[in-house]
Protein backbone atom coordinates (compact mmCIF):
# COMPACT_ATOMS: atom_id res chain seq x y z
CA UNK A 1 0.00 0.00 0.00
CA UNK A 2 2.70 2.44 -0.97
CA UNK A 3 1.69 5.79 -2.37
CA UNK A 4 3.51 8.28 -4.51
CA UNK A 5 5.13 11.23 -2.83
CA UNK A 6 3.87 14.50 -4.31
CA UNK A 7 7.23 16.27 -4.41
CA UNK A 8 9.10 13.68 -6.45
CA UNK A 9 8.52 10.46 -8.32
CA UNK A 10 10.11 8.14 -5.73
CA UNK A 11 7.90 5.95 -3.60
CA UNK A 12 7.60 6.92 0.03
CA UNK A 13 9.59 4.71 2.41
CA UNK A 14 7.91 2.53 5.02
CA UNK A 15 9.11 4.96 7.69
CA UNK A 16 7.69 7.89 5.70
CA UNK A 17 4.26 6.23 5.53
CA UNK A 18 4.33 5.45 9.26
CA UNK A 19 5.38 8.98 10.15
CA UNK A 20 2.69 10.47 7.93
CA UNK A 21 -0.03 8.39 9.64
CA UNK A 22 1.20 9.49 13.07
CA UNK A 23 1.30 13.16 12.01
CA UNK A 24 -2.20 12.83 10.54
CA UNK A 25 -3.60 11.39 13.82
CA UNK A 26 -1.82 14.07 15.88
CA UNK A 27 -3.22 16.81 13.64
CA UNK A 28 -6.79 15.45 13.59
CA UNK A 29 -6.98 15.21 17.38
CA UNK A 30 -4.81 18.27 18.10
CA UNK A 31 -2.33 16.35 20.26
CA UNK A 32 1.38 17.17 20.53
CA UNK A 33 4.17 14.57 20.31
CA UNK A 34 4.81 13.84 23.99
CA UNK A 35 1.15 13.39 25.01
CA UNK A 36 0.61 11.31 21.84
CA UNK A 37 3.50 9.04 22.82
CA UNK A 38 1.97 8.74 26.31
CA UNK A 39 -1.35 7.66 24.74
CA UNK A 40 0.59 5.01 22.80
CA UNK A 41 2.27 3.74 26.00
CA UNK A 42 -1.10 3.61 27.78
CA UNK A 43 -2.68 1.82 24.79
CA UNK A 44 0.14 -0.73 24.80
CA UNK A 45 -0.47 -1.56 28.49
CA UNK A 46 -4.21 -2.10 27.92
CA UNK A 47 -5.57 -5.50 26.91
CA UNK A 48 -6.44 -5.97 23.25
CA UNK A 49 -4.91 -4.48 20.13
CA UNK A 50 -2.60 -1.53 20.76
CA UNK A 51 -3.68 0.37 17.63
CA UNK A 52 -7.38 0.06 18.42
CA UNK A 53 -6.75 1.04 22.05
CA UNK A 54 -4.84 4.14 20.85
CA UNK A 55 -7.76 5.25 18.67
CA UNK A 56 -10.26 4.65 21.51
CA UNK A 57 -8.11 6.73 23.91
CA UNK A 58 -7.88 9.60 21.41
CA UNK A 59 -11.61 9.41 20.72
CA UNK A 60 -12.37 9.44 24.49
CA UNK A 61 -10.73 12.83 25.08
CA UNK A 62 -13.19 15.39 26.47
CA UNK A 63 -12.52 17.90 23.67
CA UNK A 64 -13.23 15.23 21.06
CA UNK A 65 -16.43 14.08 22.79
CA UNK A 66 -17.66 17.70 22.96
CA UNK A 67 -16.97 17.93 19.20
CA UNK A 68 -18.70 14.59 18.50
CA UNK A 69 -21.78 15.73 20.45
CA UNK A 70 -22.09 18.74 18.14
CA UNK A 71 -21.36 21.35 20.83
CA UNK A 72 -18.47 22.70 18.71
CA UNK A 73 -17.87 23.11 14.98
CA UNK A 74 -14.28 21.82 15.13
CA UNK A 75 -12.10 19.92 17.58
CA UNK A 76 -10.06 23.07 18.06
CA UNK A 77 -13.19 25.01 19.02
CA UNK A 78 -14.19 22.16 21.35
CA UNK A 79 -10.78 22.39 23.01
CA UNK A 80 -11.30 26.12 23.58
CA UNK A 81 -14.81 25.56 24.97
CA UNK A 82 -13.40 23.05 27.49
CA UNK A 83 -10.44 25.33 28.25
CA UNK A 84 -12.76 28.27 28.99
CA UNK A 85 -14.64 26.23 31.62
CA UNK A 86 -17.93 25.96 29.73
CA UNK A 87 -18.20 22.18 30.19
CA UNK A 88 -19.49 20.05 33.07
CA UNK A 89 -18.75 16.34 33.37
CA UNK A 90 -21.15 14.60 35.76
CA UNK A 91 -22.08 18.03 37.16
CA UNK A 92 -18.48 19.07 37.86
CA UNK A 93 -16.59 21.71 35.90
CA UNK A 94 -13.72 20.23 33.90
CA UNK A 95 -11.34 22.45 31.93
CA UNK A 96 -8.83 19.83 30.79
CA UNK A 97 -9.27 18.99 27.08
CA UNK A 98 -7.35 15.71 27.49
CA UNK A 99 -9.64 14.49 30.31
CA UNK A 100 -10.60 10.90 29.42
CA UNK A 101 -14.33 10.23 29.38
CA UNK A 102 -15.73 6.97 30.72
CA UNK A 103 -18.93 5.10 29.84
CA UNK A 104 -21.87 6.63 31.68
CA UNK A 105 -20.37 10.13 31.91
CA UNK A 106 -22.82 13.00 31.38
CA UNK A 107 -21.35 15.97 29.53
CA UNK A 108 -23.16 19.30 29.33
CA UNK A 109 -22.56 22.96 28.68
CA UNK A 110 -22.78 25.13 31.82
CA UNK A 111 -26.26 26.49 32.52
CA UNK A 112 -25.00 30.10 32.38
CA UNK A 113 -23.55 29.55 28.88
CA UNK A 114 -26.47 27.60 27.35
CA UNK A 115 -28.44 30.73 26.47
CA UNK A 116 -25.51 32.40 24.70
CA UNK A 117 -26.00 33.04 20.97
CA UNK A 118 -22.72 31.20 20.35
CA UNK A 119 -24.22 27.83 21.30
CA UNK A 120 -27.48 28.44 19.45
CA UNK A 121 -25.43 29.12 16.31
CA UNK A 122 -23.18 26.09 16.87
CA UNK A 123 -26.17 23.76 17.31
CA UNK A 124 -27.71 25.14 14.09
CA UNK A 125 -24.48 24.53 12.19
CA UNK A 126 -23.75 21.08 13.66
CA UNK A 127 -27.37 19.91 13.80
CA UNK A 128 -27.02 17.92 10.60
CA UNK A 129 -23.85 16.18 11.78
CA UNK A 130 -24.26 12.51 12.58
CA UNK A 131 -23.71 11.80 16.28
CA UNK A 132 -21.88 8.50 16.86
CA UNK A 133 -23.96 5.61 18.20
CA UNK A 134 -21.91 5.43 21.41
CA UNK A 135 -23.22 8.86 22.49
CA UNK A 136 -26.77 10.02 23.37
CA UNK A 137 -27.29 13.76 22.81
CA UNK A 138 -30.05 16.21 23.67
CA UNK A 139 -29.03 19.12 21.41
CA UNK A 140 -31.71 21.44 22.83
CA UNK A 141 -30.48 20.97 26.40
CA UNK A 142 -26.80 20.94 25.26
CA UNK A 143 -26.36 17.72 27.23
CA UNK A 144 -25.16 14.26 26.29
CA UNK A 145 -24.34 10.88 27.78
CA UNK A 146 -21.55 8.53 26.78
CA UNK A 147 -23.33 5.16 26.51
CA UNK A 148 -20.11 3.20 26.01
CA UNK A 149 -16.56 3.77 24.86
CA UNK A 150 -16.32 3.60 21.07
CA UNK A 151 -15.18 0.49 19.23
CA UNK A 152 -12.58 0.97 16.48
CA UNK A 153 -15.04 0.07 13.72
CA UNK A 154 -17.31 3.03 14.56
CA UNK A 155 -14.47 5.59 14.70
CA UNK A 156 -14.59 7.31 11.30
CA UNK A 157 -11.09 8.81 11.36
CA UNK A 158 -9.03 8.00 8.22
CA UNK A 159 -5.93 6.79 10.08
CA UNK A 160 -4.16 3.44 9.74
CA UNK A 161 -3.25 2.96 13.40
CA UNK A 162 -1.18 -0.17 12.64
CA UNK A 163 1.39 2.03 10.89
CA UNK A 164 1.61 4.16 14.07
CA UNK A 165 2.12 1.02 16.19
CA UNK A 166 4.86 -0.14 13.80
CA UNK A 167 6.54 3.28 14.05
CA UNK A 168 6.59 3.34 17.85
CA UNK A 169 7.59 -0.31 18.26
CA UNK A 170 10.93 0.24 16.50
Annotate the PLM regions.
Residues 3, 7-69, 96-170:
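Ferredoxin-like alpha/beta domains used as RNA- or RNAP-binding modules
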Residues 69-75:
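A contiguous catalytic/ligand-binding core that recognizes phosphate-bearing ligands
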Residues 75, 81-82, 101:
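Short, well-ordered loop/turn sites that connect or cap secondary structure elements
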Residues 68, 83, 89:
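Short glycine/serine/threonine-biased micro-segments
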Amino acid sequence: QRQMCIRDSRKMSEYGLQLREKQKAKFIYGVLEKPFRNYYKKAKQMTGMTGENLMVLLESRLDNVVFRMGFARTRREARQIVDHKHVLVNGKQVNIPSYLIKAGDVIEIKEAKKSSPRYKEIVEVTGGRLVPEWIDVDAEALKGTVKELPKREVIDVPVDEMLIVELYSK
